[in-house]
Regions:
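Conserved nucleotide-binding/hydrolysis micro-motifs of P-loop NTPases
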Residues: 91-94, 145-147, 171-174, 195-198
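Beta-sheet entry/capping signal
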Residues: 60-62, 82-87, 135-139, 147, ...
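Conserved Class I SAM-dependent methyltransferase catalytic core
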Residues: 114-167
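RNase H-like polynucleotidyl transferase catalytic core
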Residues: 164-176
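DnaQ-like (DEDDh/DEDDy) 3′-5′ exonuclease domain used for proofreading
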Residues: 1-87, 93-117, 123
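Short, solvent-exposed loop/turn and secondary-structure capping segments
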Residues: 75, 95-102, 150-152, 179, ...
């Protein structure tokens, strides 16, 4: 009966909605041609012997030139779980710059530019995760245009519990006086650990100038230290509102 069919269709749609994702990113996913090609093909890289740079320090480093998805697929087979640190500088998908998706430039008028960018990043970050060692971490440069989307995407792939921090850095030496609204001087670096419970940063040692502020008059076993006040270093007369 037609009415019964319509009811069944409506119930099916309701069930789909109930089973749908409740929180996180939802976008129009689209496979690139390179994804389809690699279902039945394995990327092979050819060594350029004439471009080899020999050193006497030992160890072998190499530079892969080509589609980054091809490179990641290859590294997945040779370096899975072996890389301690990854830094990537993906396309920012800004309005004044285009990026290539599926061998075509995606311009600012493309209605699916954000979905294409997310699909682009999703496939690559899934592979990147497989490369990280247990103590590994990834640093990802981004600006405000896709920072919010990238954070949710990385939470989904690496796990929200493995988010380390978001570093803000000044990309401009001085504010832009010709900005229409606010001067956009900051970009970001998202930091995720493969397993935050075991990841530890490698801190830089203090230089001689920095060390002169630290002493160890009481022979503390933990090393030189510097005393500091836990409150504001202003007097009651200078900052009465703090007292």
């Amino acid at each position: 009966h037609k009415d019964d069919d319509e009811v069944l269709i409506a119930l099916g749609e309701i069930e789909s909605e109930l089973n749908a994702k409740k929180y996180g990113l939802v976008w129009e996913r689209d496979e690139e041609a390179v994804d389809i090609q690699m279902r039945d093909n394995i990327p092979v890289f050819t060594e350029c012997v004439d471009k080899e740079i020999s050193t006497t320090t030992g160890g072998v480093n190499f530079l892969l030139e080509g589609d980054n998805l091809h490179s990641l697929r290859l590294l997945e087979k040779t370096h899975a779980g072996r890389i301690d640190l990854i830094y990537i500088d993906p396309p920012y998908n800004t309005n004044n710059k285009e990026f290539i998706y599926d061998d075509s430039f995606v311009d600012k008028t493309d209605a699916f530019r954000h979905s294409k960018w997310l699909s682009f990043m999703h496939e690559r970050l899934l592979l990147v995760k497989q490369l990280l060692s247990k103590n590994g971490s990834i640093f990802i440069s981004i600006d405000s245009n896709e920072q919010a989307q990238l954070k949710l995407l990385c939470d989904e792939i690496f796990g929200e519990e493995n988010f380390v921090d978001m570093i803000s850095w000044f990309k401009e030496a001085s504010p832009s006086n010709d900005a229409q609204y606010f001067s956009n001087d900051i970009e970001y670096i998202l930091v995720y650990a493969r397993d935050k419970s075991v990841w530890r940063p490698h801190r830089l040692p203090l230089n001689e100038k920095q060390m002169k502020y630290y002493t160890n008059p009481d022979n503390d076993s933990r090393g030189p230290w510097n005393s500091a006040t836990y409150t504001c270093n202003k007097s009651k007369e200078q900052r009465p509102s703090l007292y």
